């Protein structure tokens, strides 16, 4: 049995074997990326768990506007090589959501670590904000991204609390540790004889909103009480 914690890893494993059971998690679009035939009936040797649906980018935009209502232009950072659908999975709903509220939307792709700093610096203008896509590459380089956003005083929202633990402003997304537990349960079912082809791909059931009040203060932002009341955790 093989476990894949990201879209690139799942893609590699699916290409390498059609017989060994594969359980993936932290994957965005398993149908679009060709890992399974459908969510309800994977039909192959792989199954697992979606981390977030594409529409989540609209939610990130809404939350960023709540904490930083002055923002008029928002960029979304991702690596096309590791993001689901090369980034299009989240980009399409992000662009639509931005248009609906009259904001300028910008794609901010990065291909290497060395590109992160200039891409973030390019967004460091008054009334700009940043969304970091749910993607293995930004997660792996979260310290650099968070540090640069703070340096440029750029309001940013992230997909996982790990970014906020590192000093990021706020995050909203599924709980990674819950995905690990659910993947372990699927592994147990497969070891007991069930087939991956018949185990449906499941969506997240737990989401969390985490806000770093210290970072908000450093950015000169006042977090609305309505947002504080909805937070699962406040970091002070």
Question: What does each of the following model-derived ranges do?
Answer:
Residues 1-236:
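Short hydrophobic alpha-helices and adjacent helix-cap/hinge residues
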